[in-house]
Amino acid sequence: MNHIVTKKIQKVLGYTFTHKDLLKQALTHRSASSKHNERLEFLGDSILSFVIANALYQHFPYIDEGDMSRMRATLVRGNTLAEIAYEFDLGEYLKLGQGELKSGGFRRESILANTVEALIGSIYLDSNIKTVEELILKWYEKRLEKISPGDTQKDPKTRLQEYLQSKHLSLPLYFIVEVYGEAHNQLFTIHCKISTISEYLIGTGSSRRKAEQDAAQKALIKLGVE
């Protein structure tokens, strides 16, 4: 990563790294190098969950645990993180292996979402919890202003099921079609079948549940519900 690119991505993120190797690692997919971003992603996922949970706790003093959990799930889910990645144009900074490059990995939501988490982890290691918390809250400022408790915070699988039931349609079927990677770091691919849609809706995620949620979200969009 040359100096110009490094300077550009740091400006986009709103943070200047002391240890540039952490930035480089955060942007490196496992297909490109043995020194990839998955451990940083693990760390960043936990930090993000804490920061968002704390923000919701402070902003909504009278909301119960269930609503806060649903709001947090909405804010930290894969497609929300991918939206942030698109806003930062992260795809153009990723270091991918040839296979992922050819298959359009720089546009894949799961890779982009994981990279945002890895960046959070790397910024924490490069600075401290206060700095990374302030940065996350800046990234999420508009989303935190807009979010509110209610049915819209139900997860995609629940919303899809309730929609289909309201139309007296069959419930969706989910099938695992591929599990890639080692046991501690797998990528699941799920097919979701809806009776009124001819093709399968494809979801991916780091767990079966996340992949099913991704597929359900795509089904809701396909059905014109969202």
Curated annotation (Swiss-Prot):
Keywords: Cytoplasm, Endonuclease, Hydrolase, Magnesium, Metal-binding, mRNA processing, Nuclease, RNA-binding, rRNA processing, rRNA-binding, tRNA processing. It is found in: Cytoplasm. Mg(2+) binds at E41, N114, E117. One of its GO terms (biological process) is mRNA processing. The keyword RNA-binding applies. Residues 6-128 form the RNase III domain. One of its GO terms (cellular component) is cytoplasm. InterPro entries: dsRBD_dom, RNase_III, RNase_III_dom, RNase_III_sf. It is an enzyme of class 3 (hydrolase). Its cofactor is Mg(2+). PROSITE patterns: DS_RBD, RNASE_3_1, RNASE_3_2. CDD domains: DSRM_RNAse_III_family, RIBOc. Pfam families: dsrm, Ribonucleas_3_3. It catalyses: Endonucleolytic cleavage to 5'-phosphomonoester. Disulfide bonds: none annotated. The active site is at D45, E117. Its main location: cytoplasm. Homodimer. PANTHER family: RIBONUCLEASE 3, RIBONUCLEASE III. Digests double-stranded RNA. Involved in the processing of primary rRNA transcript to yield the immediate precursors to the large and small rRNAs (23S and 16S). Processes some mRNAs, and tRNAs when they are encoded in the rRNA operon. Processes pre-crRNA and tracrRNA of type II CRISPR loci if present in the organism. Belongs to the ribonuclease III family. This is Ribonuclease 3. It comes from Buchnera aphidicola subsp. Acyrthosiphon pisum (strain APS) (Acyrthosiphon pisum symbiotic bacterium). The lineage of its organism: Bacteria, Pseudomonadati, Pseudomonadota, Gammaproteobacteria, Enterobacterales.
